[in-house]
Amino acid sequence: MKALTLTLAATFASIAIVGLTAAQSIPSLEKKPLELGNFSVSLAVKDIKASKAFYENLGFKEVAGKLEQRWIVLQNGNARIGLFQGMFEKNIMTFNPGWTTDKQTLPDFQDVRELQHILKQRGIKFTTEADESTKGPASFLIADPDGNTLLFDQHVPSPKR
């Protein structure tokens, strides 16, 4: 039994080493890092006033939005969340290319259309797409394998590259 266990362990180790070597030699797996920009979580809430009070008790401060329009953005250090009442059904992870955590425009960044192009090449399926013939603000949506929505939402002019 011990010999069988050792043989199986050696076989799996060989498979893992061969798989790793093969994967490293495939150019499509060598991925350029993406500059996704500022990250926040957009929460679909039922009662924006109750949600705002809850997050303020956690130390978050309102930094943007309009409560009367049922959306606000709260921040605590580098953590940023958006509260949205009646605007979408599920929570969304949001990336803002070109923005710092305090909504300052970066001098150089990957435009949302460049990110979209790279993700298409990697086989990512899109829920909505940015118009690649335009410049400036644009957005697209994708979903991860579990159905979580990711929004890539550029609010600033395209960088001059």
Predicted regions and their residues:
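Bacterial N-terminal signal peptides that target proteins for export
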Residues: 1-9
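N-terminal beta-strand motif that seeds the catalytic metal site of vicinal oxygen chelate
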Residues: 12, 17-49, 155-161
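Core segments of cupin and vicinal oxygen chelate
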Residues: 35, 42-87
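Structural preference for beta-strand elements that scaffold enzyme active sites
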Residues: 40, 92-94
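Vicinal oxygen chelate
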Residues: 46-49, 87-88, 95-149
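Short beta->alpha transition motifs characteristic of CBS
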Residues: 65, 84-87, 132-134, 152-159
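Short hydrophobic/aromatic beta-strand element in the GNAT-like acyltransferase core
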Residues: 71, 80, 92, 139-141
